[in-house]
């Protein structure tokens, strides 16, 4: 059987940034790593209904800075910033250093693999037909400018006795092209018949020289050659 490498992991440092950017000595590295894991766990639990996309952690000079990427920033902030202040105190307690929380809004949630996978999983838990949920996600992504999308679900689909997997794809999803900006995420739907896994790949275009291929200068086309008249 063919094995597939993780689409995000293989592109780190090429077209994908890291979710944690800090340096530490060998004595502090394990503690920082454990702290990052616990902070992510805490924020994911607290922000279940906030359409959380990703959490970026930085550690400048004995402090921690957390950037929360979400499609619903109002839910994270709360009334007069009460909720975000509560989160800041919780993160500072877990990390053991002063914390700062920034919130970044995801403008197009239909093009974010994490949000699409979570949306499909929540629909499956509400007993929406899996084919309808998949096709709706694919159509929304293509409508908003994705160059390609693939969605796969696996498990006891429709309550079947035997588990199987089905997928639906539209456009291009070039997994072997390292300069391709591919967003990948997974989610789990806990249904009455068991767990259904959801995988989403979204191709947003190629990155050439640090900028999207759509903005790159196209090479000039050669002038058409004049045809010689045949001698009679």
From Swiss-Prot:
Alphabetical GO biological process terms: translation
A single MF term (Gene Ontology): rRNA binding
The entry's keywords: Ribonucleoprotein, Ribosomal protein, RNA-binding, rRNA-binding
Annotated Pfam families: KH_2, Ribosomal_S3_C
CDD domains (alphabetical): KH-II_30S_S3 (cd02412)
Superkingdom as given in the UniProt entry: Bacteria
GO cellular component, one term: cytosolic small ribosomal subunit
SUPFAM superfamilies, A to Z: Prokaryotic type KH domain (KH-domain type II), Ribosomal protein S3 C-terminal domain
Domain KH type-2 span(s) in chain numbering: 39-107
Entry-linked HAMAP family: Ribosomal_uS3_B
UniProt cross-references to PANTHER family, sorted A to Z: 30S/40S RIBOSOMAL PROTEIN S3 (PTHR11760), SMALL RIBOSOMAL SUBUNIT PROTEIN US3C (PTHR11760:SF19)
Family, similarity comment: Belongs to the universal ribosomal protein uS3 family.
Function: Binds the lower part of the 30S subunit head. Binds mRNA in the 70S ribosome, positioning it for translation.
Subunit text: Part of the 30S ribosomal subunit. Forms a tight complex with proteins S10 and S14.
Listed name of the protein: Small ribosomal subunit protein uS3
Organism of derivation: Aliivibrio salmonicida (strain LFI1238)
């Amino acid at each position: 059987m063919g094995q597939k490498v993780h689409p995000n992991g293989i592109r780190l440092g090429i077209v994908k940034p890291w979710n944690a950017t800090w340096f530490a000595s060998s004595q502090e590295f394990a503690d920082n790593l454990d702290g990052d894991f616990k902070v992510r766990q805490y924020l994911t639990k607290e922000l279940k209904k906030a359409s959380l996309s990703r959490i970026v952690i930085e550690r400048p000079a004995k402090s921690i800075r957390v950037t929360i990427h979400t499609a619903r920033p109002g839910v994270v902030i709360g009334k007069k910033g009460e909720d975000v202040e509560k989160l800041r105190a919780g993160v500072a307690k877990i990390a053991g250093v002063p914390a700062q929380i920034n919130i970044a809004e995801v403008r197009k949630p239909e093009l974010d693999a994490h949000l699409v996978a979570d949306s499909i999983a929540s629909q499956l838990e509400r007993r929406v037909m899996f084919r309808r949920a998949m096709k709706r996600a694919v159509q929304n992504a293509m409508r908003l400018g994705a160059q390609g999308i693939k969605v796969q679900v696996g498990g006891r689909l429709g309550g079947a006795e035997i588990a199987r997997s089905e997928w639906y794809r539209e456009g291009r999803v070039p997994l072997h092209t390292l300069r391709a900006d591919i967003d990948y995420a997974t989610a789990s739907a806990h249904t009455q018949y068991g767990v259904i896994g959801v995988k989403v790949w979204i191709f947003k275009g190629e990155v050439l020289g640090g900028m999207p291929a759509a903005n790159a200068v196209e090479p000039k086309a050669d002038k058409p050659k004049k045809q010689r008249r045949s001698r009679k």
